[in-house]
Design a protein with these regions (language model features):
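Formylglycine-dependent sulfatase
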Residues: 2-4, 10-19, 23-160
Length: 165
C-alpha cells in the first residue's frame, strides 16, 4: 500500500508539472521593439502626433498611433552633447563630464579630443546584452575619435554624421 501511495503521489506531481509547463511558456512575454527619437530644436507640437497641423508627418503619426507616446520628457541641458549623454547613460551631464560651461565646451564638434568616456555604460550596451539589435542614425555628437564612437560601444549599426543641419 505504501508503494502505491508513493507512486500515486509521483503520478499526480508529474501530471501537475505537465499542466504547468504550457502555463510557464504562456507567461513568457515578447520583448517590445522600440525606437527612441531624439531631436534638437523641436517644439512639443511641431509634429503630427502632438498636434501639428503645419507639418505632415505620416510615418511618425503611424508610429504614435500603433505604439506608445511619452509626453513628459525633459532634457538635462539646452545643448546637444550634454543632453545626448544623459539620454545614453541615464546620468546627469556633469557626472559624465559633458556638461556645458561658460567657455562653450558643452558641444563636441568634429576633431574634438573629448568624448563620452568609454567606461560609461550606455542604453545600447544594456539592450544589446539583453538580445536587442541596436543602432544609431543621425548626429552622434558624443565624440568623433574612434574610442568614443558608438561602434566601439557595442551598437550594431552606425549611420551618423557629425555636422548640424
Amino acid at each position: 500500500m505504501k508503494a502505491f501511495s508513493t507512486l500515486f503521489r509521483l503520478g499526480v506531481a508529474c501530471v501537475l508539472l505537465g499542466l504547468a509547463l504550457p502555463l510557464a511558456k504562456a507567461a513568457e512575454v515578447e520583448r517590445p521593439n522600440f525606437i527612441i527619437i531624439f531631436c534638437d530644436d523641436l517644439g512639443y507640437a511641431d509634429i503630427g502626433p502632438f498636434g501639428s497641423v503645419n507639418h505632415r508627418t505620416p510615418n511618425l503619426d503611424r508610429m504614435a498611433a500603433e505604439g506608445r507616446r511619452f509626453t513628459s520628457f525633459y532634457v538635462t541641458s539646452g545643448v546637444c552633447s550634454p543632453s545626448r549623454s544623459s539620454l545614453m547613460t541615464g546620468c546627469y551631464p556633469k557626472r559624465v563630464g559633458l556638461h556645458q560651461n561658460e567657455k562653450g565646451q558643452g558641444v563636441l564638434f568634429p576633431g574634438n579630443q573629448r568624448g563620452l568616456n568609454p567606461s560609461e555604460i550606455t542604453v545600447a550596451e544594456v539592450l544589446k546584452a539583453r538580445g536587442y539589435a541596436t543602432g544609431i542614425v543621425g548626429k552622434w555628437h558624443l565624440g568623433d575619435q574612434p574610442e568614443f564612437l558608438p561602434t566601439d560601444r557595442k551598437s550594431t549599426r552606425l549611420n551618423s554624421s557629425h555636422t548640424s543641419i
